Curated annotation (Swiss-Prot):
Keywords: Metal-binding, Nucleus, Repeat, Zinc, Zinc-finger. The keyword Nucleus applies. It comes from Drosophila melanogaster. InterPro entries: NOA36. GO terms for biological process: larval lymph gland hemopoiesis. This is Zinc finger protein 330 homolog. The keyword Transmembrane helix does not apply. Residues 272-303 have a biased composition (Acidic residues). Residues 228-248, 263-315 are annotated as: Disordered. It is found in: Nucleus; Nucleus, Nucleolus. Belongs to the NOA36 family. GO terms for cellular component: chromosome, centromeric region; midbody; nucleolus; nucleus. PANTHER family: ZINC FINGER PROTEIN 330. Residues 304-315 have a biased composition (Basic and acidic residues). The lineage of its organism: Eukaryota, Metazoa, Ecdysozoa, Arthropoda, Hexapoda.
């Protein structure tokens, strides 16, 4: 029979598990020291933590380590590459290198110098929208909450507003015509219950099913506000009625300003208003003359049968 665990031993085991979870937990990208906010001491502009100011190229008075996040090295005896026994160091006396990926200072601790370059979270931090890296803009880096892609500070809201849009025009599975119950927010595709699972692959019950294409965790489609991509072909009228109601002039000028900025109500207007009025007056005069000619012709046609009847009566 195994011995019963005492209360003190149970507490120690729980504390071990808790510390293990804390060490292995995933820290959000916005809370990492290499992506911390920084305000320049000289130009007072807010930006991402970096070795030199993005705007004025000045050095910070108190640089922050990109790995451990400390400002002051308080280790009297430790793994410091530059030994300083009995003395606390700050500023440039604490730093040891500049990271090529996040452009931030790394302290002179041996552990930070060896580990940060291999585990820097901003190694491939290129914005999905503008395709700029850390060195091309001064803002911080964020991740999309849907597709988990890198975004700069300027495009993060615009991208996340349009991220839940499928590449297809319906919610059907890409391999069959069944309704896609699972959606991959990175590939922007839907999968049914049969095609989301790969053959010969074991899945955990309590974990989301990975995408068969990119291995990113899929989400249930009904839990998301997914929308489909719509394609509009042909000439689309801008805020007016259909072409059948107004003819072919509806797209160019009907209902206010048309495609070319004209204010006509049914077509083009090449000349000025005065020219149009004069041309209208000339057209009215010509139409009156035509009406008089028509009346004279009608009178002559009516008088001819009367003359024939008079001739017959005299005979």
């Amino acid at each position: 029979m195994p011995k019963k665990k005492t209360g003190q031993r149970k507490k120690a085991e729980k504390q071990k598990l808790r510390l293990k979870e804390i060490r292995s937990r995933e820290v959000p990208l916005a809370d990492l020291p290499c992506n911390a906010p920084m305000e320049c001491d000289k130009c007072e502009k807010k930006q991402k933590s970096r070795a030199f100011c993005y705007f004025c190229q000045s050095i910070q008075r108190l640089p922050i380590c990109a790995q451990c996040g400390k400002i002051k090295c308080m280790l009297k005896t430790g793994d410091c590459v530059v030994k300083h026994p009995g003395v606390y160091t700050t500023g440039l006396g604490m730093v040891g290198a500049i990271c090529d990926f996040c452009e931030a200072w790394v302290c002179h601790g041996r552990k930070c110098l060896q580990n940060h370059a291999c585990t820097c979270p901003l190694q491939n931090a290129t914005c999905l929208e503008c395709e700029r890296g850390v060195w091309e803009h001064g803002g911080r880096i964020f991740k999309c909450s849907f597709c988990n892609g890198f975004l700069c500070e300027d495009d993060q809201f615009e991208h996340q507003a349009s991220c839940q849009v499928l590449e297809s025009e319906n919610y059907k599975c890409q391999s069959c015509n069944k309704l896609g119950q699972y959606s991959c927010l990175r590939c922007k595709t839907c999968y049914c219950e049969d095609h989301v699972r790969r053959k010969g692959f074991k899945y955990d019950k309590n974990k989301p099913i990975p995408c068969p294409k990119c291995n990113y965790d899929t989400s249930v489609t009904k839990d998301l506000s997914m929308s489909t991509r719509s394609h509009k072909f042909g000439r689309q009228q801008q805020g007016g009625n259909s072409d059948d109601e107004e003819g072919y002039g509806g797209y160019y000028g009907a209902g206010g300003s048309g495609y070319y900025g004209g204010a006509a109500s049914g077509g083009y207007s090449y000349g000025g208003d005065d020219d149009e009025d004069e041309s209208d007056g000339d057209y009215d005069d010509e139409s009156d003359e035509d009406d008089d000619d028509d009346e004279e012709e009608d009178e002559t046609t009516e008088s001819e049968p009367e003359k024939e009847t008079d001739k017959k009566a005299t005979k």
